[in-house]
Amino acid sequence: MINTQFEQHGFFYIKGFYTARELAQVHEVINCFHTQWIADNQQFYQTKAVNSAYLTANTYLDDAQRLLLFKFIASHKLMAQVDSILDPAAFMNTQLFFNPVNPEQENYWHRDMQYHLSLLEQQAALSGPEVIHCRVALEDEPGIELVPGSHRRWDTPVELATRLSENGHHSSDDLASGQVIEMQAGDLLIFSANMIHRGLYGKDRLALDILFCEPEPHVLHFVQDICLPSAKMLSRLEDASAFAVTLAHQE
C-alpha cells in the first residue's frame, strides 16, 4: 500500500491514534527513563537540551520496561502505518522530545541530515533513502511545524538562509511555507526526517519519536546494538519485522 499523503506532503497525521490506556504504561516507563537521563545529563539539560535518545537501551530501563517499549513499537496498528511508507521498514532509534529549561530558548528549522551531510549531500539525500519519525504525543503540546513537500525538493533561498542562519536570517524565524500541526496526547504524526521542520516548545511538551528507515547500510550505521531486542523479546512482539530487518543487517 502506498501512502499517497506522505508521498505528496512528507507527513501524515492521525488524531487520537492511541487511547489514554495505551499511553499510560508507556508514559510511566518513559518518565522513569527521563528522570534518570536528566540526573545524568544535568549541565546539558539545564543549558540547551530539547531531546534525548536510545530509550530502548538497557542504560536506564530494565528488561520488563524495555519489552513494554518494544511491544508498543512493534504493534500491528503502528506497523501498518509504517509499512504504508517503507517496504521493508527497519527500526532505527527512539528519541524523547521535551521543553528546554530556559523558556527564552528558541526553536530552529532544520533537516535531520544537515548535521552529518554537506549541502550537496543533503540535496542528493532527497532522492533516498527515506527516514521517518513516528511522533507520539504523550501530552498536549504546541506540536511541530513542517514545510510540506520539502522531503522531495530543495530549499528556496529564504528557507536555506533561515535554517542555516545566514544573510541576516535566523533559524528561529517564521517561514511562510511552514504548516503547524498542533498535537494532543495520543495523536500520531509521521513525517520525513529529510523535510524542513521545527519543534514548537510550550505546554507540557513530551513526545516519543520512533524512527524507521529503509535498510541501507549507511543509514543503519547509526543503529546502536544495545537498543535492539533480544531473541527472546523478539518472539513476544506482535510485528517484529522492522526489528528483524535491522538485526539482519547488524550481523
Across the structure, where does each feature detected by a protein language model lie?
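Double-stranded beta-helix
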Residues: 139-196
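Short, conserved beta-strand element in jelly-roll/cupin
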Residues: 119-143, 182-183, 211-215
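A short secondary-structure junction signal
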Residues: 105-111, 118-121, 143-150, 155-159, ...
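Non-heme Fe(II)/2-oxoglutarate
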Residues: 27, 42, 188, 194-251
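Non-heme Fe(II)-dependent double-stranded beta-helix
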Residues: 2-9, 15-121, 231
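Active-site glycine-rich loop that binds ribose-phosphate moieties when present
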Residues: 113-122, 166-169, 173-174
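Extracellular structured ligand-interaction cores
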Residues: 93, 129-133, 141, 178-180, ...
